[in-house]
A protein has these predicted regions:
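A generic alpha-helix structural signal
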Residues: 24-27, 55, 59
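Conserved GNAT-fold acetyl-CoA-binding loop/helix
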Residues: 33-56
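A short helix-loop-beta-strand connector motif used in the catalytic cores of GNAT acetyltransferases and
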Residues: 43-44, 56-71
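Acyl-donor (CoA/ACP) binding surface of acyl/acetyltransferases
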Residues: 1-22, 26-36, 69-178
């Protein structure tokens, strides 16, 4: 799949084999920053070999139309600013997916993920042909809630003990896009 979405300050595209080191650097530099918002990770998650396998798995997910993981890069493609995934794609009468995302600590608060996600959502509702994109966030993750709100997501409900994040079953606010 050769999707390249350029925004004024980012380039959004699927990861290729050559991106394993950049993904590893992103994971290592943001390990503590992202830990409160992610599942518990085994130590091997933070190896270059695991990053290479992750990219291979992502590419297979795209091939099977099950998910569309993207890197958010600086325009020169030197650094991973963040990642997002249009995951758990369901076709047929539903035409929907779940959105997940992460942004590097040093890039947060600059509107870069909003820019990248606007581009990705336009692609999801356009060429990908989705009707619904769902996103959930933990109530204490106010930054995530504000980002989703700016992207036009509307609160749909409150799911108690919905996902195991950082070893704890967390409540999530459920939302949808358009």
């Amino acid at each position: 799949m050769s999707v390249r979405l350029a925004t004024p300050r980012t380039l959004v595209r699927p990861a290729g084999e050559a991106d394993a080191t950049a993904l590893w650097q992103f994971r290592m530099e943001n390990r503590q920053h992202l830990a409160p918002w992610e599942p518990l990770r085994e130590e091997r998650y933070y190896t270059q070999g695991h990053c290479a396998q992750t990219i291979a798995d992502w590419r297979e997910s795209i091939r099977l139309d099950r998910g569309y993981p993207f890197l958010v890069l600086d325009p020169g493609e030197r650094e991973v600013i963040g990642t997002f995934n249009l995951a758990n794609v369901v076709r047929g009468v539903f035409q929907a997916c779940h959105l997940g995302y992460a942004v590097a600590q040093r890039w947060q608060g600059q509107g870069l993920m909003r820019e990248a996600l606007e581009s990705g959502l336009d692609w999801a509702f356009g060429p990908l042909g989705l009707h619904r994109v769902m996103a959930n966030y933990m109530p204490r993750n106010e930054r995530s809630g504000k980002l989703l709100e700016r992207l036009g997501f509307e609160r749909e409900g409150y799911a108690k003990r919905y996902l195991c994040i950082a070893g704890v079953w967390e409540d999530l606010i459920a939302g949808l896009q358009r």
